């Protein structure tokens, strides 16, 4: 990439538009990630074990995957702003259902409904970010939008943990339902975006035929299973060995989110070096960090809080690599590809919650961390394969 391209800057209007998209991602990130610090209290209140809440989390992931698979061929023909606002409003209603759940079955149904809404929100948001930004700024634009995950962790998840201590986990869910409603209103204030030229109903085979897409989706599956498997059960593992409240999960999320957010300062390197060159090193470093998690947990919960900072930094680059590469293809197919990305992400979420939940219940957190590291090693190996890697 040329120095002139690297020197391009965001206009104030584009920055404001990306901020609204960041809020949408932050809302989804908050409701998806807040389960971790609340899991122990939710299980106790509903008289079930942690694995049952893990299965409910898995149904959330299944809901995202189903919605994204249904929406993926249509996202390039739908008015994205309207679809995004409606999905955020639906998310708010589903979160209210979580707050009112009388048992684990009702909670699982409400979480599945949250997933259906998120399955539209995520690909629509990523596709809009790709539409708004010029090619030379795309990695930086995507980096800004995915900072919503950092906002969710740095501010949202710790706040949810504190709310749970004051209002209970149900009160925390009720407050986040209101946040989803506010996010819907913010999206409605965006100017109507023009659909990419040639936007149409896109069959899956057309989206999957783009060079590199199938490989990247398999890498995404391994990558996301590693993250969600470790993150979902880490706090419960720590609380089982130390008598600490849900605020511990908030501290872990705060440290992770700070690392994830600070890493945005390095997103320009992805534009200059190219995402493929960053992929394998990032995945291998993450694999090493996964193996360190159970060792840190055995030492002290606060050792995990410290380790979460570099985890967040490296995970930012790994996620940006995947989203940037998948969103860099033909504009008229971008919505379909990002829909498939969201579907695969939350198939991984489902497998991590349901499948690795059984591993956690039977063999403990160390086994989960080893499986996560192995998945990341697979993703790194695929990134280094010599076949055509361009999307």
Predicted regions and their residues:
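Helix-to-loop junctions at the C-terminal end of transmembrane segments
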Residues: 67-79, 263-275, 360
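Helix-breaking motifs and short loop linkers at transmembrane-helix boundaries and internal kinks
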Residues: 47, 79, 100-106, 296-298
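Conserved MFS/SLC helix-loop-helix module at the cytosolic interface between two early adjacent transmembrane helices
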Residues: 66-102
